[in-house]
Amino acid sequence: MPDRISKETFLTNIKDGIIVSCQALPGEPLYSPEGGVMPLMAKAAEEAGAVGIRANSVRDIKEIQAVTDLPIIGIIKKDYPPQEPFITATMAEVDQLAELGIAVIALDCTKRQRYDGRPIEDFIREIKRKYPNQLFMADISTFEEGLKAFEAGIDFVGTTLSGYTSYSRQQEGPDMTLIAELCQEGIPVIAEGRIHTPEQARQINELGVAGIVIGGAITRPKEIAARFIKALKD
């Protein structure tokens, strides 16, 4: 198992760089029941100069760890209907990820009702008590959610879910306003969500973020192709 990385070291490693999200869910073209695809994506990202990887599932994370030493932000996506949160939604997923020795565990920290019925602040405090040396990232959709998670003890706040909750800003590109507001509050922000172009990434970096995660624009060829095709048709 890799040594735990300190918050300071992680922040230094990801500064002015790109973390690449390498994920594919069942039903998507790059998903393979046998695995083996995401580590190829991760290796390509590393060769391009990526400073980290975001990955989903124990299987994919282990396969990625076998091919790269880049720090990993890990999640487990699992539905708990009728509740909406599905990104590392319960302690069971946190426990599985903690065993992998990854740099950061990310989890849904929105205000939506949770499967366990508990306020998210209570859950954050519990996971920090249980795993005091583990870094955690809050996936949020609004400024209030980010502030609440940070005040509860979360290490990093990600703008991952802006536009993916019914009450958050709905827009085509990244939520620059949310990113700027969180940075101005002095919160370590990992910008993520609908960052489609290098220019957008550069603009976000200039806002003073701790890090940037890019997924669909790099590792989802179906989405990338669709964007080009739509541009020609429009």
Swiss-Prot record:
Keyword Isomerase recorded: yes
SUPFAM superfamilies given in the database record: Ribulose-phoshate binding barrel
NCBIfam families, alphabetized: PRK01130.1
Biological process per Gene Ontology, one example term: N-acetylmannosamine catabolic process
Name the UniProt record assigns to this protein: Putative N-acetylmannosamine-6-phosphate 2-epimerase
Pathway annotation: Amino-sugar metabolism; N-acetylneuraminate degradation; D-fructose 6-phosphate from N-acetylneuraminate: step 3/5
Enzyme Commission identifier(s): 5.1.3.9
Family affiliation: Belongs to the NanE family.
One Gene Ontology term of the molecular function aspect: N-acylglucosamine-6-phosphate 2-epimerase activity
Stated role: Converts N-acetylmannosamine-6-phosphate (ManNAc-6-P) to N-acetylglucosamine-6-phosphate (GlcNAc-6-P).
Alphabetical list of PANTHER family matching this protein: N-ACETYLMANNOSAMINE-6-PHOSPHATE 2-EPIMERASE-RELATED
Pfam families: NanE
GO cellular component: cytosol
Superkingdom field: Bacteria
Catalyzed reaction equations: an N-acyl-D-glucosamine 6-phosphate = an N-acyl-D-mannosamine 6-phosphate
UniProt KW keywords: Carbohydrate metabolism, Isomerase
